[in-house]
Regions:
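Noncatalytic scaffold domains of N-terminal-nucleophile
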Residues: 1-173
Length: 173
């Protein structure tokens, strides 16, 4: 993912960080054949764009971009943070390793995306319970994610962009 962060500190200092995603190096427009209809998003129905054949821009490997979130959050932490990266990721590591009771809203979201999550072995292993949607209150444990966060905490953003985590993602794709 990606995003934009605006920071205002108590002393009046601050700034912003734009950490948008980037298309993969081998991505090109011909990979995304347009159809003759629009995709309309959001309750306001004000956002639309041309539909892409087979949802190639939204589902599967051709929808994956280079995430900017790790770089953006680590940059923000370096500029304005008061703790080190390993301390910042520690609570998330604990939750990922020990698990937590799956909230109702997340269980519903996973059930809604069951067919899509079933298509890919990795998403099925992480987000489904023996091929079925996880139910509210299920113990949601993500050991591999905990290991990734530990590595990011030790190494920093370079782990995502050229390090072990980035290499693992590139190899899978």
């Amino acid at each position: 993912g990606g995003g934009v962060m605006v920071v205002h500190m108590d002393d009046g200092s601050g700034g912003s960080v734009d950490f948008g995603m980037q298309a993969a190096g081998l991505a090109h427009a011909e990979m995304y054949e347009l159809e003759d209809e629009l995709v309309v998003m959001g309750p306001s129905r004000r956002f639309s764009w041309p539909k892409v054949k087979n949802n190639a821009n939204m589902e599967g490997y051709t929808s994956i971009s280079i995430p900017g979130t790790v770089a953006g959050l680590t940059t923000s932490l370096e500029k304005w943070g008061t703790i080190d990266l390993d301390q910042a990721v520690a609570p998330a590591i604990k939750l990922a390793r020990e698990g937590f009771a799956l909230p109702r809203t997340m269980a519903l979201a996973l059930a809604e995306k069951h067919e899509l999550l079933s298509r890919f072995p990795t998403t099925a292993a992480v987000y489904l319970n023996n091929g079925s949607p996880m139910s509210t209150g299920s113990d949601f444990v993500q050991t591999e994610y905990a290991e990734t966060l530990e590595r990011l905490g030790r190494v920093g953003a370079s782990d995502m962009y050229g390090g072990e985590t980035g290499a693992r993602i590139a190899e899978d794709i």
